[in-house]
Structure formats: structure tokens, C-alpha cells
């Protein structure tokens, strides 16, 4: 049937129109009006069911049925012309079987509407349900309030191109079933697709909505998009296009993203909108090739390797809403290949799976967090930067899984933490911040770890980790160090506060050639047992303190150098616990207290400085002080050396606390500075068990206590004095050699107590005095030199005694004394 020039045509009820030739349309209204309530069937190529032209109208009523069977044979067509906008509506049924045979087509400003009762079904490849294309006096328009179903390959539910507009209304339902059969497509600048109803796709690579080449796609508040096939994204914007979701998007297939932007496009998940993905590798939102993705709503991914948001190849992703991922290796946000990911102040990221990183920057990318990141799985770091990337945190990061770091920089990357109370980890081995392989980590906020073996900050393999001004590090687990550097060129440094509360949790650690530096203004404090303030272990490792170090637990030394390492103190060291040395060098290591350095210990058996083992050395140019019984100033053990240099002062303030002790074969104690002891039996210097003690010309040894000997050689040891020895106290001898030991004096010895000999040799020992005006005693019974029990005393210098019964030289029990000097 054909009506023209304002005419009318009707196909009623049981009537049937059937055509068989090519281009043989069922009904045509050319600037006219046509209705069908019967049946229309076409068989030829390019044979439409109903066609309106030049402002005409065609209507397929509720009882109307249109069937086309060949290629390009559309069911309903509205073809505008000039300023004339043609119209076509469907309230009945339209079925097409041929390839590229659309259910309804609006072209050159035409309009087609599938009404609430209308049903459109297409079966051929590229047989789109409804199409609006080309501009006329107005954009071409296709709307659906009914049902649209396509079965063919690449057969879209609704398709807008070249400036057309397609709308799936609130009551509209779109279903596609084949590969590449997208629900709605908007192609070209000015083309728009909107959905307020339901869009469902079942095929592989079948997107819910697709905007490309400048098109725009909108899933509105009531809109529901659901896809079931692999690679079937909910919404896609490509080639400078735009897609926005204000409703709901659900995908079930593998590699099926909620929303994807690529090739310079922009996608938005707006406030109150939801995205849910169920398949593996199905990200919530993704931006690729210079595109941008923004989330203001909520994103949920349920399977493994399914990121909340991903930005790739120069793209950006910003989260202002909520991201939740449930699967293994399902990152909250990913920025890859010079891309950017940002989580704003209102943004929240929660991941549950193992290795599910909160935010991950990779390949020269950057990630910023101003909001909240929480991870629960093992190895699920809060933020990670890798391969020349950067991650920055101004917000809050919390991890609960084991080996789940707060922030992690790898392979020449950078991480920065600026927020107060900002990083907290709860699992074992979950470090606060870690930099590895020539990377950098900076903290000016808060880092807290609770698990065992969970360090505050770590630098590995040539990396740098710095706790800056404002930074506070606190660890609570066993073996959880405040800061740790491992490997040559690795460095940790502190300018503010480091606290550890667990057992064997050191403040700062340098291993295997690394460095640990506590700078001016830095404070390091440990509170539990065996928790050193600073530790350097391994050849080339170096620990330096320029600030303050405080330890409170038993066996918690201030600074320790082990295995050919070095520890230097230029600041303040304080230890409170028992058996807590100020500084310890062991296994061939070196520990030095510099001129500005102060070492103070308060616990029992807490020596100021200790060197243990061959080639180990402790040296002092500053001040060393001990305050409890049995706490020596400086100790050399098992072949080690202890040296108090010209500017060094050593002071002990309790009983049985020697100024310096050398113990064991080959051990050596050297004094060139000042040693002062206050306490009974607190000798100035002691050499025991084949050891040696030397007080050089610049050295001064002062003791104040009963039986507090100036220098004491015991058990085949030797003691030499070239400097000054002064003792105050009864039986406080100037020098004593006992059990086959030797003591020699070239300097000055003065004693001020009763029974305080200048020099004393006991049990097959030897004493020699060579100095002019070298021995003077002031107490009763304070002999100048005494040799007892097969011992020998020789004087070629000067001996003066001032007390009663104070002999110049005295030999008893098979001993001998000889003098060629003055007595």
C-alpha cells in the first residue's frame, strides 16, 4: 500500500499485505498517514514492512504484525526529508530475519517509537533492533518503551549514529543474544544513547552500552545494564566519547568490565550509581589510551584479578566514592604505563583477597590517596609503586593480612606518606613502608605496625627510606624494628620519632652494607627486652646517631655493630634496662662515641661501651657514664680493643663498676682521656686473663671508693701507666698485678686512702716503677710498692709515702723488692 500527498492508508484486522520483490515495501506513507492492525510480510531484499517519507507517519498498532525475511529489510522506517520529520510507531510486533535488517529505523530526522506494548525481534547478523541515523531538521530519534530482542551476530539492541539519538525508556527492555551484539550504541559526534530501562546482553564481547567516535551513552537513574558473556563490558566509551552511569551495571563474564573508556574518552559512575562485576579479570572501571574514568558511586568486583578501577597508557582514574574488591589479586585501583590513579578525600577502597593491593602504580605511573584504603588479604599492600612510579598518601591506609605492607616502592619508584595517623598494619611481616631496588620512601606522617616481624620503614637493594620531620613510627610486635636498611647503598634515616614496643625490636637497623642514620632532632626509643636502639650488622654496614636514642628493656643496647660493621654516636644514648650496653661492637666491628656523643646507662651490668671478639673495637671521644652496680665504662672481650681517646671521659657511679676492662687473651684497654669511678671495687682500668691495659701520657685515671684500684692486671695480664693515676679510698691501690701479671709505671701514681699501696704485686707477679716523682701515698699503711707471694717489685723512679706505717717498698712471702731510685 502507498499513500502520498496527504493521503491515508489502513491495513485492518485479519488483512494481510505480502510482497515478494526487492524494494517492495508493505506500506508507504509519503507525506501521508498509514496504519497497520493486520499483518505485513515482505520477502525481497530491501523491502521494509512500513515506511514513512517526507513528514509522513506510519503506525503499527497493538494487533499489527510485521515480518520481513531478507537482507536490509527493516520492519519500520521513518525517513525525514528537508524540514519534514517523518514518524513511525510500533505497538504491535515486528520481526526481521535477514542480515542487516533492522526492527525500526529513523533516518534524516525521522522518529521511530516502540511503544509499551510493542515488540521488536531481529534474527540476522547486524540486524539491529532500532536505529537512528543522520541529521535532518532535527536529530533522528528512536525510543523504546516496549521490548527489543536481537539474535544475530553484531546485532545491537538500539543504534544511534551520525548524530542520531536512541532512548530506552523506563519500561523498555532490550535483550541481545549473540557475539558483539551490544545493547545500545551511539556512534559519531552528536550521537546519543540513553537508558532508563533494562539492557541485557548474553553474547561474547557484547557491551551493554557503547559510545564511540564522539558519541555519548547515559545509563540513567532507573537504568539497569546486565551482561553475561566474556569481554562483555557494561558500558564502553571509545575514540573521544563519553559514557555515564547513574543507575546499575552488572557483568558476569570474564574480562567484562563495568565501564571502559579508551582512546581519549571519559566515563563517569555518578553518585548513587552501582557497578558489580562477577567474572575473573573483570574490572569495575577502566580507562585506556589517554582516557579518564571517575567514580562517584560504588564499585564491587567479586572475582580474582578484577580491579576496582584501572588506568592504562596515559590514562587517569579518580575515585570519589566506594570501591570494594573480593577476589585474589584484585587491586582497588591500578595506574599502569604513565597513568594516574587518585582516591579523593571522600573515596574509600576495601580489598579482601590475597595480593589485592589497595592502589598500584606501575610503569612510570602515579597514585595519590587522600581518602581511606583498607586491605585484608595476605600480601595485599595498601599502596604500591613499581618501575619508576610514584605513590603518595595524605589519607589513611590500614592492612590486616600477613606480609601486607602499608606502602611499597619497587624498581626505582617513590612513595610518600604525609597523613597523620595514616598507615597502620596488623599482620605479621606487614611493614609500614618499604622501598626496594633503588627506590625511595619518605614519611612525615604516622606509621604503626602491630604484627611480628613488621618493621616501620624498610630500605632494600640500594633504596632510601626517610622518616622526616613530623614523622612518627611505632611498632608493637616481636622482632618488629622501627627502620631497617638491607644491602649496599641502602639507607634509612630519621629526623623525628621512632618507637618500638615488642621484644627484639630494634629502633634502626643496617644490614649487609647498608646505613642507618638518626639525624639531629631524631628520637629513637625501644621499650622491651633485647631491643637495641640502633644495629649495624654485616660488612660495610654503618649506624650513625646524631640525635637521641633511648632503650628501656633488659639486654637492649643503645647501639650495636656486628660483623665488620660500624656504629658511630654523635648524639645521646641512654639505656635503662639491666645488661643493656650503651654501645657494642662484636665480630670484628667498630663502635665509636664521637666528641659530641654521650653514652649513659642506668641498669645493672649495663656497660657503657663493649667490644667483643678479635678485631672488634670501641673508641670514645665524648662522654661515657654508667650508674648501676657492675656496669663498666668500656669493655674489651676475647681479643677486642677498647680505647678512650684524648677528649673522652668515662665515668662510673656505682660499686664494682670499672672505668675500663680488657678481658680475655689479646684484649686491650687504652686510655688517653679521663676515667673517673665512684664506688667500692670500681677500678679505673682492669686487664684480666691474658689481657692488657695502658694509660698513656694524656690519660688520667681517678677512682673514689674502697678497694677501687687505679689500674689492675689479673691472671697473666699486663698494665702500663704513662699518665696520671689518683685513688681515694682504703686499699685503693694505684696499680695492682695479680696471678702472674705485670704492672709498669712511667707516669704518676697518687693514693689517698689507708692501706692504699702505690703499686702491688701478688702471686708471682711483677711491678716496675720508672717515673720521676712517680709514686706518692698519703694514708696510713699505704706502702709505695708491695711484692707478695713470690712476686717482684723494682723501682728506678721516685717513691714518697706520707702516712704512718707506710713503707717505701715492702716484700713478703718469698718476694723481692729492688730500688735504684729515690724512696
Where are these regions (language model features)?
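Beta-strand-rich solenoid/repeat architectures in extracellular/passenger domains
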Residues: 8-23, 38-46, 58-72, 85-99, ...
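Glycine-rich beta-solenoid repeat tracts in large extracellular/virion proteins
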Residues: 1-4, 24-30, 48-53, 74-81, ...
Amino acid at each position: 500500500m502507498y499513500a502520498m500527498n496527504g493521503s491515508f492508508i489502513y491495513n485492518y484486522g485479519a488483512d494481510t499485505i505480502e510482497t515478494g520483490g526487492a524494494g517492495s515495501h508493505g506500506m508507504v506513507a509519503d507525506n501521508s498517514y498509514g496504519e497497520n492492525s493486520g499483518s505485513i510480510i515482505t520477502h525481497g531484499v530491501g523491502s521494509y514492512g512500513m515506511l514513512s517519507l517526507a513528514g509522513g507517519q506510519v503506525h503499527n498498532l497493538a494487533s499489527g504484525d510485521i515480518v520481513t525475511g531478507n537482507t536490509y529489510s527493516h520492519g519500520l522506517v521513518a525517513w525525514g526529508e528537508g524540514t519534514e520529520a517523518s514518524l513511525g510507531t510500533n505497538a504491535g510486533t515486528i520481526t526481521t530475519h535477514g542480515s542487516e535488517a533492522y526492527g525500526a529505523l529513523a533516518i534524516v530526522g525521522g522518529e521511530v517509537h516502540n511503544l509499551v506494548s510493542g515488540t521488536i525481534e531481529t534474527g540476522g547478523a547486524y540486524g539491529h533492533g532500532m536505529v537512528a541515523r543522520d541529521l535532518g531538521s532535527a536529530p533522528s530519534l528512536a525510543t523504546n518503551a516496549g521490548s527489543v530482542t536481537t539474535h544475530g551476530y553484531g546485532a545491537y539492541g538500539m543504534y544511534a549514529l551520525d548524530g542520531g539519538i536512541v532512548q530506552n525508556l523506563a519500561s523498555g527492555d532490550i535483550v541481545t543474544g549473540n557475539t558483539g551484539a551490544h545493547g545500545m550504541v551511539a556512534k559519531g559526534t552528536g550521537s546519543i544513547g540513553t537508558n532508563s530501562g533494562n539492557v541485557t546482553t548474553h553474547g561474547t564481547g557484547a557491551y551493554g552500552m557503547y559510545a564511540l567516535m564522539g558519541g555519548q551513552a547515559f545509563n540513567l537513574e532507573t537504568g539497569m545494564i546486565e551482561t553475561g558473556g566474556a569481554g562483555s563490558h557494561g558500558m564502553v566509551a571509545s575514540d573521544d566519547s563519553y559514557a555515564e552511569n547513574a543507575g546499575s551495571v552488572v557483568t558476569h563474564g570474564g574480562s567484562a568490565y563495568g565501564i571502559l573508556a579508551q582512546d581519549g574518552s571519559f566515563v563517569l559512575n555518578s553518585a548513587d550509581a552501582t557497578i558489580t562485576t562477577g567474572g575473573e579479570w573483570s574490572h569495575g572501571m577502566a580507562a585506556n589510551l589517554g582516557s579518564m574514568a571517575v567514580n562517584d558511586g560504588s564499585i564491587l568486583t567479586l572475582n580474582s584479578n578484577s580491579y576496582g578501577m584501572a588506568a592504562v597508557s596515559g590514562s587517569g582514574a579518580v575515585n570519589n566514592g566506594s570501591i570494594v574488591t573480593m577476589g585474589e589479586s584484585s587491586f582497588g585501583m591500578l595506574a599502569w604505563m604513565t597513568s594516574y590513579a587518585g582516591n579523593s578525600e571522600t573515596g574509600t577502597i576495601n580489598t579482601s583477597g590475597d595480593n589485592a593491593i589497595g592502589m598500584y602504580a606501575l610503569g612510570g605511573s602515579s597514585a595519590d590517596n587522600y581518602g581511606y584504603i583498607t586491605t585484608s588479604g595476605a600480601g595485599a599492600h595498601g599502596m604500591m609503586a613499581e618501575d619508576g612510579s610514584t605513590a603518595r598518601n595524605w589519607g589513611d591506609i590500614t592492612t590486616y593480612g600477613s606480609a601486607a605492607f602499608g606502602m611499597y616502592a619497587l624498581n626505582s619508584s617513590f612513595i610518600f606518606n604525609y597523613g597523620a595517623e595514616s598507615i597502620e598494619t596488623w599482620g605479621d611481616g606487614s611493614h609500614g613502608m618499604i622501598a626496594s631496588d633503588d627506590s625511595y620512601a619518605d614519611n612525615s606522617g604516622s606509621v604503626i605496625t602491630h604484627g611480628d616481624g613488621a618493621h616501620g620503614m624498610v630500605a632494600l637493594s640500594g633504596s632510601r627510606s626517610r622518616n622526616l620531620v613530623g614523622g612518627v613510627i611505632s611498632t608493637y610486635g616481636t622482632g618488629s624494628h622501627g627502620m631497617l636498611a638491607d644491602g649496599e647503598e641502602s639507607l634509612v634515616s630519621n629526623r623525628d620519632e621512632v618507637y618500638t614496643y615488642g621484644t627484639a625490636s630494634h629502633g634502626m637497623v643496617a644490614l649487609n652494607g647498608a646505613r642507618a642514620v638518626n639525624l639531629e632532632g631524631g628520637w629513637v626509643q625501644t621499650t622491651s627486652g633485647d631491643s637495641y636502639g640502633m644495629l649495624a650488622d654485616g660488612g660495610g654496614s654503618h649506624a650513625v646517631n646524631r640525635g637521641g636514642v633511648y632503650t628501656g628493656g633488659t639486654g637492649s643496647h643503645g647501639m650495636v655493630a656486628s660483623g665488620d660493621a660500624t656504629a658511630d654516636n654523635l648524639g645521646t644514648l641512654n639505656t635503662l634496662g639491666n645488661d643493656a650496653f650503651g654501645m657494642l661492637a662484636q665480630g670484628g666491628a667498630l663502635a665509636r662515641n664521637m666528641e659530641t656523643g654521650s653514652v649513659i646507662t642506668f641498669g645493672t651490668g649495663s656497660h657503657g661501651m663493649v667490644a667483643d671478639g678479635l678485631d672488634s673495637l670501641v673508641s670514645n671521644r665524648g662522654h661515657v657514664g654508667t650508674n648501676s652496680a657492675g656496669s663498666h665504662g668500656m669493655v674489651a672481650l676475647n681479643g677486642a680493643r677498647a680505647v678512650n681517646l684524648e677528649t673522652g671521659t668515662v665515668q662510673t657511679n656505682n660499686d664494682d663498676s670499672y672505668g675500663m676492662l680488657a678481658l680475655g687473651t689479646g684484649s686491650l684497654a687504652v686510655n688517653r682521656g679521663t676515667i673517673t669511678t665512684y664506688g667500692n671495687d670500681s677500678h679505673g682500668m682492669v686487664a684480666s686473663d691474658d689481657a692488657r691495659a695502658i694509660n698513656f701520657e694524656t690519660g688520667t685515671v681517678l677512682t673514689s671508693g674502697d678497694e677501687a684500684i687505679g689500674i689492675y692486671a689479673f691472671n697473666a695480664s699486663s698494665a702500663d701507666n704513662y699518665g696520671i693515676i689518683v685513688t681515694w679510698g682504703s686499699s685503693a691501690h694505684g696499680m695492682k698485678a695479680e696471678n702472674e701479671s705485670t704492672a709498669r709505671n712511667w707516669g704518676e701514681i697518687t693514693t689517698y686512702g689507708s692501706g692504699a699501696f702505690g703499686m702491688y704485686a701478688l702471686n708471682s707477679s711483677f711491678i716496675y716503677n720508672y717515673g720521676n716523682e712517680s709514686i706518692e701515698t698519703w694514708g696510713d699503711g699505704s706502702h709505695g710498692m708491695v711484692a707478695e707471694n713470690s712476686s717482684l717489685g723494682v723501682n728506678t723512679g721516685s717513691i714518697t709515702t706520707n702516712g704512718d706505717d707506710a713503707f717505701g717498698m715492702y716484700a713478703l712471702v718469698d718476694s723481692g723488692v729492688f730500688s735504684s731510685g729515690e724512696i
